[in-house]
């Protein structure tokens, strides 16, 4: 059982979007293979949410900019004595490859957007109980196809996101590993500090404290208020130790 709980909080809109995309892509695989109605609806709901996120901004443009920014950051490390040059070069090549694949890929989500079954289910998801067999006979018969046939179709849908997912995973790994965790202490449940142009806050709390952080702020400055899970009887200690990374 985990003794620490990790919280992540974006400090700008692009990071907020990326974390949502990462979460939704991870959710696509949770209930595979799609063996029943509940598993299928979970899958299609996450597909629909992903398409909604894609339609709100220039996801590919922001990722390509970030891939270039990370390459420049790695270039600055080349001249630092003692740095593992082979590791730096390997990461730069990964960034270049991810960028080339992403820029040559079709519009993000286009294959999913044009799929008839996904479109039909997506239309009905906003209606309470709108995915019954009489509302969606297409989904009903699809769920009665051989498992292997459904698995192959699901695999094709997920694979269409690979160019995006590979670039996003690489970027988030680099950002998350850009700063170590450091011990901090809050006073009376409150902590604030400068963001130093960070994109992401990562905070670790002891599980047995049964506290969670409410974080506000941006890349220049942020504030953290610790709240008890039990809002009526829970207590926040006068001094609370936690670990924080500004990435």
Curated annotation (Swiss-Prot):
InterPro entries: ZapD (IPR009777), ZapD_C (IPR027462), ZapD_sf (IPR036268). Disulfide bonds: none annotated. The keyword Membrane does not apply. GO terms for cellular component: cell division site; cytoplasm. One of its GO terms (biological process) is FtsZ-dependent cytokinesis. Gene3D superfamilies: YacF-like, YacF-like domains. Its main location: cytoplasm. Keywords: Cell cycle, Cell division, Cytoplasm, Septation. It holds the Pfam family ZapD. It is found in: Cytoplasm. The keyword Cell division applies. Interacts with FtsZ. Belongs to the ZapD family. Cell division factor that enhances FtsZ-ring assembly. Directly interacts with FtsZ and promotes bundling of FtsZ protofilaments, with a reduction in FtsZ GTPase activity. HAMAP family: ZapD (MF_01092). This is Cell division protein ZapD. It comes from Citrobacter koseri (strain ATCC BAA-895 / CDC 4225-83 / SGSC4696). The lineage of its organism: Bacteria, Pseudomonadati, Pseudomonadota, Gammaproteobacteria, Enterobacterales.
